[in-house]
Amino acid sequence: MLKEFREFAMKGNVVDLAVGVIIGGAFGAIVTSLVGDIIMPIIGAITGGLDFSNYFIPLAKSVTATNLADAKKQGAVLAYGSFLTLTLNFFIVAFVLFMVIRGMNKLKRRQEAAPAAPPKPSAEVELLTEIRDLLKKA
């Protein structure tokens, strides 16, 4: 049973999937940092120093806090600022994946478009061609 599991785990598709999941997780952390630490502060500076991560609508009358963390402790809130940040994060990931797949498709098309060299004629065909050429000369 251990041998069968080892064979299954070492198949190309399983290993490729594992590598993809690990790289995807690392890429997700990079994109999250890009959105939260670079893009959203720039957008906040353009819009007058607004911090989108703290935007919320209180859904309970007991919520009086001005920041999201305290507001969540006081009651139900609709944290639309966090949603905007995560939505931007999603679109960046989707765009990067689109560009990667687009590049891979272009490479595939180039490889498919390259015409294959015609196969070398067999020895019989070469011999018959020589005979034909000699008969034409005679």
Swiss-Prot record:
Keyword Cell inner membrane: yes
Domain of life of the source: Bacteria
Membrane-traversing stretches: 19-39, 40-60, 81-101
Topology within the bilayer: Multi-pass membrane protein
Single GO cellular component term: plasma membrane
Record has Transmembrane helix as a keyword: yes
Assembly: Homopentamer.
PANTHER family: LARGE-CONDUCTANCE MECHANOSENSITIVE CHANNEL (PTHR30266:SF2), MECHANOSENSITIVE CHANNEL MSCL (PTHR30266)
Name of protein: Large-conductance mechanosensitive channel
Higher taxonomy: Bacteria, Pseudomonadati, Pseudomonadota, Alphaproteobacteria, Hyphomicrobiales
Gene assigned in the entry: mscL
